[in-house]
Amino acid sequence: MKGEPIEAVNVGLQSLLSALRQNPYALDSVYLSIFTFDSEIKNVLPLTALEDVTLPIISTPDSGPTFLGKMLEELVNTVQSEQILGSINQKGDWRPILILLTDGKPSDVMAYNNAIPQIKSLNFGNIVACAAGPKADPNVLKKLTNTVVSLDTMDSNSFAQFFQWVSASVAQTSVSVGASASNTLPPPPNEINIVF
């Protein structure tokens, strides 16, 4: 992802942050973390309280592999080490929400397939995967989650609509660890296609 698409992702992340910061409920309960994945896996924003987030500028190499499986493995390790589970003696974290955005297919298919059951065992409040552009394969993402959307065009408007929808989804699907809840999402805008 280069040029306008990655710039649109950065602008979209800013709009997501702005929308969440206007929600007093989110200010009290949302933490953000961002991983990037290409030939390297980077946690470019470690888990940070919403009010303390300073977004990094996301950049991508000109070409190379898409180590989605390795990123999911890193994510599993991070969630397992950082999530506070509720108990009689302490209040737990809210169930995490995973938003995955990719413009390609996993280069590490075996690692991706092995990471899927681990991700599913973490009891995410919701997992939303977005296949952005013609090189992304929604069917591969359907192995990870039933909530897969696609963006046919990777322009500023499409990404803006996607991130607005994500911010509404975060507000709607945050539920406490251990609580059962519906993972129904708000309807997406026209620029976002639900993959069945």
Where are these regions (language model features)?
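P-loop NTP-binding core
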Residues: 88-90, 112, 193
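Von Willebrand factor A/integrin I-like adhesion domains
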Residues: 134-196
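Short, well-ordered amphipathic alpha-helices
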Residues: 13-21, 74-84, 113-116
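Von Willebrand factor
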Residues: 1-45, 53-94, 97-101, 126-140, 151-165
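Short beta-strand-loop
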Residues: 28-58, 138-144
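VWA/integrin I-like adhesion module and closely mimicked acidic/polar interface patches used
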Residues: 86, 104-143
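Switch/connector loops and helix/strand junctions flanking conserved nucleotide-binding motifs
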Residues: 2-3, 41-45, 107-110, 136-142, ...
